[in-house]
């Protein structure tokens, strides 16, 4: 692995977890985020005094800010952890073009650049499942074009993830927030099997694997672990963990569950993990273990949780918008 890494989108959910892992691996990390959307300085607050971590704001629609970030980092590896917020819009990839065009110009103008790999991480979000297909196809064409121009790009597509540092914008985090707050716990399509859901630590492992072993121009897919749990059973695992670690004043957290029927939410991208397995992908964390670890993380980080609960009040108080409840 490289010694100097630049992470764009490094204050978001997946980016934050990646930054922590890179620092743990001994990397010098240059972290760039525009702090729009769910990007959150609180995610990286404890890293601000670390000598191996530097943070600066960067808007990937601004070529000058991108150039300044590239000059500052002088990175061996770039991790791009930003996914379009509106994948169905024609303009969804405009910022991607700006970013990679700027990187190409910068690299062509440097005689001593050490940049050897750019890993583009495309993460599906539960709320937008079923709307990524066309954007993803167009993105791969865009990336292939820049590979042909000489940029050392590999990509990784990941399904909806959950785990530490996640705001209440997915079914798992929504359940945890509502349970801790003693609110009704919405469980969508309770009898459906959990499918294509992955622990964020496994996502980070896959990103690092692609950086280390992935081919230039390679496009890789990560799938969730095989799981026999229904959505209701997954909620029960979360509630049981909370019953043990944070017993409610009365009864059990399961009493808060409200079953909600809605249209099935599925991805419109067919994933094939075979190429990632060839790189050396290891077994993933089981859903049950990952859910318990996630609950424990929230309970062990009350300062982060309390600030997130306040800042993102509009999310966890409006589950129908997050969970696509009709």
Give the ranges of each region predicted by the language model.
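N-terminal Rossmann-like NAD(P)+-binding domain of SDR-like oxidoreductases, especially those catalyzing
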Residues: 1-159, 301, 318, 326
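Generic structural signal for small/hydrophobic residues in well-ordered secondary structure
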Residues: 14, 33-35, 44, 175, ...
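Hydrophobic alpha-helical packing elements
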Residues: 14, 65, 135, 171, ...
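C-terminal substrate-binding subdomain of Rossmann-fold SDR/epimerase-dehydratase oxidoreductases
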Residues: 24, 179-183, 187-326
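Short, surface-exposed alpha-helical segments at coil->helix boundaries
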Residues: 41-42, 137-140, 173, 232, ...
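Conserved sequence/active-site signature of Rossmann-fold short-chain dehydrogenase/reductase
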Residues: 61, 126-127, 161-163, 198, ...
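The catalytic Tyr-centered alpha-helix of NAD(P)H-dependent dehydrogenases
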Residues: 128-136, 164, 168-172, 196-200
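Conserved SDR Rossmann-fold cofactor-binding beta-strand/turn motif
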Residues: 157-162, 176
